[in-house]
């Protein structure tokens, strides 16, 4: 089952992306480098909970 997750910017801008992940294949915290339009550069995004 794919669960919805929120990717929070590590730049502290408050920007986030939403996506899904398969917890069976990826049990750990998800991290990916994506573009932050507020900071206008690529930064690390880390997994957080959707409230």
UniProtKB/Swiss-Prot annotation:
Single biological process term from Gene Ontology: translation
MF terms (GO), sorted A to Z: structural constituent of ribosome
Region of interest (Disordered), ranges: 1-23
SUPFAM superfamilies assigned to the protein according to its UniProt record, in alphabetical order: Zn-binding ribosomal proteins
Segment forming the signal sequence: none
Keyword Kinase: no
GO cellular component, as recorded: cytosolic large ribosomal subunit
Polar residues biased stretches: 7-20
PANTHER family: 54S RIBOSOMAL PROTEIN L39, MITOCHONDRIAL, LARGE RIBOSOMAL SUBUNIT PROTEIN BL33M
Name of this chain's protein: Large ribosomal subunit protein bL33
Organism: Saccharophagus degradans (strain 2-40 / ATCC 43961 / DSM 17024)
Taxonomic lineage of the native organism: Bacteria, Pseudomonadati, Pseudomonadota, Gammaproteobacteria, Cellvibrionales
């Amino acid at each position: 089952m794919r669960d919805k997750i929120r990717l929070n910017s590590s730049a502290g801008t408050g920007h986030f992306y939403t996506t899904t992940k398969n917890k069976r294949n990826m049990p750990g915290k998800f991290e990916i480098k994506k573009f932050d339009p507020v900071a206008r550069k690529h930064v690390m995004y880390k997994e957080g909970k959707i409230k």
